[in-house]
Every structure is written in structure tokens, then in C-alpha cells.
């Protein structure tokens, strides 16, 4: 049976087109996906991301567990509230999921994982946690909102009690804190996001969600669907699990080598394979593409390079650039001239560094 967030009726009342996303009925847009995209780049938008899975980890051995479980190093997390992006790998070095981990106390960490991977993530984490006597708690009592855009932080802080505003305004990137709502319920506010814009992601009790959503809409924040969330994240150069990487792809093959820490004394799952890949290189790579001709890059399209064939992973029309952009996985090596097969035509594309857009600004290499 399809799942619904606490805001399902609210989305429908706002005219949202609802679709099935990983077993959840979610808004794809509220009228115009392109208008929603531009509003986040220029102002502030709010996303219902309550389909994401929140997992709390409790116990004196949580940090040793995470040193084993994650390819990035939780030893970086020393200040309560600090967050880290990491891949969780299988023994073959493939990506089980990408996630954000928060350090709350030495005996208390928090994961935010993808909706599509909920069941396998929980099974894998529980299996690994048993050896460390760590309690794994799924927080189904919490909803999650993302408020993103250049005006997002101001719109959120203006709704908070004055006693909390200063701390929230000073919150650094990839950091979180807990504050009390006007009804004395706890809001977990994190300066993170999936759009390439500044803003907050907020975990809050289910029963508080509609009130906060409506309060933000009254300030001029617009509701944004998952369609614009996808074009925003692709412009920002952010991977989508299941499309840009999966259990057959290592971080080095998904342009996520920067998330791998081969620090001494930490034998994380999949490390041996990644060490070999680091030494010997990988046979395939993920690259960014931009197409100057009219048309759209789509998942699965064949990509032709001097080294051989690959395929488009994520592809879309970029509202900010007014051109088609995408990620492709192709054979390793300098791609040189690249073409994409679209309806039996070989269309030239340019290889560009990503992100394509950061905080509303086209990156300087895009139109070189």
C-alpha cells in the first residue's frame, strides 16, 4: 500500500500533481516545475521530504560502529550537531546508500537515509550494529521539511522565538541544533540541503508539521515539488542514489572519491577494494555533460567517447542554464570529443566540471 506523509491533504489542496516516489505519494509539482525551480534559486521554497528515513543510533560503541560502517571518517565529528556526508559500502566497495550522519552525543548519532533504500539500510545497519551493542531506532514519529533558497534562512529564523534566533542565524554549514517551537516541541534544524542553495532541513514531530508549513507559506515561501528538487540537485552536481550510483558502483566511479577517507587504523567495510582502486585506478568514471543543441539528455541514452561507450545517468533540461545537462558514466580516460545518441542521431556534447550551478550562479567553466 502506498504511503502518505502528514501533508498529503495539504498538497492536494494546493493543487499538487501527486506521483508514486519509492512507494510514497508525493507532489511532483504544484503547477509549473520550472517556476518552482526559479523560485528556489531566487527566493525561497519549501519541500516536503518526510519520505526520507531518520535513524537514531544509541550506545557507547556508536562511534566504533560508524568507523566500520562508513567510508568517510566520523572522527571528523567532534562538536555536537556537526554533520558529515558519507557512503555506506558493501564488501565489494559498492554503494549501499549515501547518507548524512549527525553527531549529537558520544552515545547518540543520527542518520538521514534515502526513502528507496529504507528496508535494506535498516537491515544492514542492524546486522552491523549487533556486534557493537548499538540500539538502532527508526524515527517514524518525525516529519522533515526542507526550506531552500537565498531567502530561506531568514524566513525560518523570523518564525522562531527571539531566544533562538541568534543561535540559528549563526549555525554553520553542515551543522544542526535543537530549538523549541512555540508549542514547546523540539525542532531539529540543520543547515543542509539538496539544491545547491543555502537553507535548512527541519525535523519535527508529525503533529507540528502542518502548522509550520502553513506559517512558512504565509511569509511568501512557495511549495516546491520533487520535479524541481531533481533539476535543482542536478544543477548543483549532487548524486541521486539508484540512478547515479548503486551497489555495483564504487564512490570512485561516482565522482564521490572526496567522501572516502583512507585514514590509518580504520578498517571500514569495502576499504580493501577502494584501496586497490585508489592505487590502480578505475575502469569507468562519472562526468558532467552540457548540450548546446536543443533537446534533453535522458537516463539510459548511449554516450560515445574515444575510449568506448557509456550512458547517461541523470539528465534534464536546466532552467538556470537554459540547456540540457547530465551525468554520464563512461570508460576512464580523457573523454575528448563526446557524442550522445538521441533518436539515432549522434549529438555533440561538452564535458564540463560540476556543479553546473552553485547558489544561483553559473559556474565559470560552463560556457568556456
Swiss-Prot record:
GO terms for molecular function: aminomethyltransferase activity; transaminase activity. Transmembrane segments: none annotated. It comes from the Bacteria. One of its GO terms (biological process) is glycine decarboxylation via glycine cleavage system. Keywords: Aminotransferase, Transferase. The keyword Acyltransferase does not apply. It catalyses: N(6)-[(R)-S(8)-aminomethyldihydrolipoyl]-L-lysyl-[protein] + (6S)-5,6,7,8-tetrahydrofolate = N(6)-[(R)-dihydrolipoyl]-L-lysyl-[protein] + (6R)-5,10-methylene-5,6,7,8-tetrahydrofolate + NH4(+). One of its GO terms (cellular component) is cytosol. SUPFAM superfamilies: Aminomethyltransferase beta-barrel domain (SSF101790), Folate-binding domain (SSF103025). InterPro entries: GCS_T, GCS_T_bac, GCST_C, GCV_T_N, GcvT/YgfZ/DmdA, GcvT/YgfZ_C, TrmE/GcvT_dom1. The keyword Transferase applies. It is an enzyme of class 2 (transferase). Its EC number is 2.1.2.10. NCBIfam families: gcvT (TIGR00528), PRK00389.1 (NF001567). The glycine cleavage system catalyzes the degradation of glycine. The glycine cleavage system is composed of four proteins: P, T, L and H. HAMAP family: GcvT (MF_00259). Belongs to the GcvT family. This is Aminomethyltransferase.
Amino acid at each position: 500500500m502506498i504511503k502518505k506523509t502528514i501533508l498529503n491533504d495539504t498538497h492536494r489542496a494546493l493543487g499538487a500533481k501527486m506521483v508514486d516516489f519509492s512507494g510514497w505519494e508525493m507532489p511532483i509539482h504544484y503547477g509549473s516545475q520550472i517556476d518552482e525551480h526559479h523560485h528556489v534559486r531566487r527566493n525561497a521554497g519549501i519541500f516536503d521530504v518526510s519520505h526520507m528515513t531518520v535513524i537514531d543510533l544509541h550506545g557507547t560503541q556508536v562511534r566504533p560502529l560508524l568507523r566500520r560502517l562508513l567510508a568517510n571518517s566520523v572522527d571528523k565529528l567532534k562538536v555536537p550537531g556537526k554533520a558529515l556526508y558519507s557512503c555506506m559500502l558493501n564488501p565489494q566497495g559498492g554503494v549501499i546508500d549515501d547518507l548524512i550522519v549527525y553527531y549529537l552525543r558520544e552515545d547518540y548519532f543520527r542518520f538521514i537515509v534515502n526513502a528507496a533504500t529504507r528496508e535494506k539500510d535498516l537491515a544492514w545497519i542492524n546486522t552491523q550494529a549487533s556486534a557493537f551493542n548499538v540500539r538502532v531506532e527508526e524515527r517514524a514519529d518525525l516529519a522533515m521539511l526542507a526550506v531552500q533558497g537565498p531567502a530561506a534562512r531568514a524566513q525560518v529564523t523570523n518564525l522562531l522565538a527571539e531566544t533562538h534566533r541568534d543561535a540559528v542565524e549563526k549555525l554553520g554549514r553542515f551543522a544542526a541544533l535543537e530549538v523549541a517551537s512555540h508549542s514547546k516541541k523540539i525542532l531539529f534544524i540543520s543547515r543542509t540541503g539538496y539544491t545547491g542553495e543555502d537553507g535548512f532541513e527541519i525535523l519535527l514531530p508529525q503533529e507540528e508539521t502542518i502548522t509550520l508549513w502553513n506559517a512558512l507559506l504565509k511569509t511568501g515561501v512557495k511549495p516546491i515539488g520533487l520535479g524541481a528538487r531533481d533539476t535543482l540537485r542536478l544543477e548543483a552536481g549532487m548524486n541521486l542514489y539508484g540512478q547515479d550510483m548503486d551497489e555495483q558502483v564504487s564512490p570512485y566511479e561516482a565522482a564521490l572519491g572526496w567522501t572516502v577517507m583512507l585514514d590509518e587504523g580504520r578498517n571500514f567495510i569495502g576499504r580493501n577494494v577502494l584501496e586497490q582502486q585508489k592505487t590502480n585506478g578505475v575502469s569507468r568514471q562519472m562526468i558532467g555533460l552540457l548540450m548546446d543543441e536543443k533537446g534533453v539528455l535522458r537516463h539510459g541514452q548511449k554516450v560515445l567517447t574515444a575510449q568506448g561507450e557509456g550512458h547517461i545517468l541523470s539528465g534534464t533540461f536546466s532552467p538556470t542554464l537554459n540547456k540540457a545537462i547530465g551525468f554520464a558514466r563512461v570508460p576512464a580516460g580523457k573523454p575528448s570529443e563526446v557524442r550522445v545518441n538521441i533518436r539515432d542521431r549522434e549529438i555533440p556534447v561538452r564535458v564540463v566540471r560540476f556543479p553546473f550551478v552553485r547558489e544561483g550562479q553559473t559556474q565559470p567553466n560552463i560556457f568556456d
